[in-house]
Amino acid sequence: MTFPDHRDSVGSVHDLLVAHNIPGIEGIDTRALTRRVREHGTLLCVFGPSEKVQEMELILEELTPPDADDLVAQVTCNGPTLLNPGAEDSEGRPLPRLAAIDCGVKHNILRELCKRFEVVWCPADMPLEEIIRDWSPDALFASNGPGDPAHPGAATEARKTLAAAVRHGMPVMGICLGHQLMGLAAGLRTYKLRYGHRGSNQPVMDLETRRVYITSQNHGFAVEDPVQGMLAPHPSGACSDTSDNVLGAEFMVRHVNSNDGTVEGLDLLDKPAFTIQFHPEACPGPHDASPL
């Protein structure tokens, strides 16, 4: 990293990192590190000069997991905004209005939604009563976002809005964190995966059609299987209900991860609502699930 070894080099990696104030590391046993992560799952860590091991250990003891913070509150928008007022389809007819609950939404998701709806971009803690009173949406969308879905902060407020919309009979779709919030509202538990689902090649099976989608995912939590518990394949997508279900509707598991059997999507049986754990628009990534 210190000395460039190519004839066309104009500097070293070390100099480049220093110039941009980026930490780097070299000379470690990567195989030992791989084994440790494999055995213990995702870990908090620090790195620094070998002569400062004790200082780094003290820093590590004081670290708190990022999921302990109210991450949704840090990334949601400040207030509601109508993104594409007066939006029309190709034949000049007004598009239906969608309230998009921002739990950390990607801009490309908003762009895709604006192709199909007149979109009201709403903060995660905005109650359904205010959304209906001020914007009169035809449907509601709960977005992706960071952190623990069970955190008692903005994510919990978004879950209340999501559940209220379902009980109201409004069409609802949740993706990623929105899917997990729907699972919690249905009375299921969420849990931290030992290894999160990351990347653009995650296979997901639709239990109704038996089709497998290649999907883009980036999450560290999952919704438990209502029949067989956590990390167990769901054999049939059978209808399930729980005592803590506040949706006012029964649901079924519709999608599962083909690698580890974790729940990837829920369908409500008598309400116009469904969820998926992955990113349907996948920017960047595969477009198998874009019709969803």
Region locations from a protein language model:
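Short glycine-rich anion-binding loops that position phosphate/pyrophosphate groups of nucleotides
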Residues: 144-148, 178
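Structural motif
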Residues: 139-143
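Amide-donor transfer/coupling interface in amidating biosynthetic enzymes
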Residues: 1-98, 103-117, 125-136, 152-168, ...
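The conserved SAM/SAH-binding core of class I Rossmann-like methyltransferase domains
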Residues: 101, 122, 175
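Gly/Ala-rich beta-loop-alpha elbow adjacent to hydrolase catalytic centers
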Residues: 174, 178, 183
